[in-house]
Amino acid sequence: MMAYLVQTIATKFIFLILIFSLTKAAISLPFVVFLGIGETCQSMEEFIQILEKDSGNHGHCIMLGDNVEVSVLVPIMDQVTLACQKVKELDELKNGYNLIGISQVKNFISVGGPQAGVAGAPNCSFPICARLTNLLNLLPVYSTFIQASVAPSNYIKIPTEIDAYLKGCKFLPYANNEIPSARNPIYKKRFSRLHNLVLIMFEEETIITPRESSWFGYYPDGSTNVILPFNETQLYKEDLIGLKALHEAGKVTFKKAPGEHVNLSDTLYEIISPFLKDESSTQKIAVA
């Protein structure tokens, strides 16, 4: 999963991440929305306005250059760096939004995020993504060239090519602590400090395959015949990133939203909005 990277959170494949932080200040904090692949601030304007109205907090939209191209062409780790730089430039966030201090993060909400990966090239329709998707279908997805040139390749996990995935994929296996020799205990420690993890899956999802990846479910290694629920995966059983610890502590919430990938329905707003509202005078919110 990419979730534990919330301390330096960035855009990922067509989904939004909402992070909430704690502070001793008694004023409301602004929130930040990072865009997914092919999205622009203009396309998400209504979404942000509704959240602003419901939460009473000001929202910021973060674009990484021409987001349509950057989200597809720039490796995810580089997007992380760009996103952090953008946030640091916003004076309004200096006292209430911390991308580095994971201890300040309270709730993590993933809206249709491919937490366990995707089994193949994304089914996207806008021109540049469609062309690159065709490229992914023609060339080795774990080659150095593709991994450095096509961002979605960084979280493609082909169940029948696990060895190649672990050796060649430049983001997801590191993010999910799947490589035994490269596991980082800090990722697990920080992710385990979350107060709540909210995972939203779209019921008619076709962009992310399998759609259960939004709930950390995935195919077993070597097969696409069945989909394992989150608690039967290696990531959960070995608690590679702290998901099991959060679940056993009652801190994981699974939600379904109607429609296709990131369908901005009333149901989606109803799921998200309560987490954007203050629960006490000492709890404030930042969203990424």
Residue ranges and their predicted role:
Residues L29-F31, L35, M77-K167, I207:
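Serine-dependent carboxylesterase/thioesterase catalytic core
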Residues A3-S28:
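Cleavable N-terminal signal peptides of Sec/SRP-targeted secreted and luminal proteins
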Residues K24-D66:
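Short, surface-exposed "cap/lid" segments of acyl-processing enzymes
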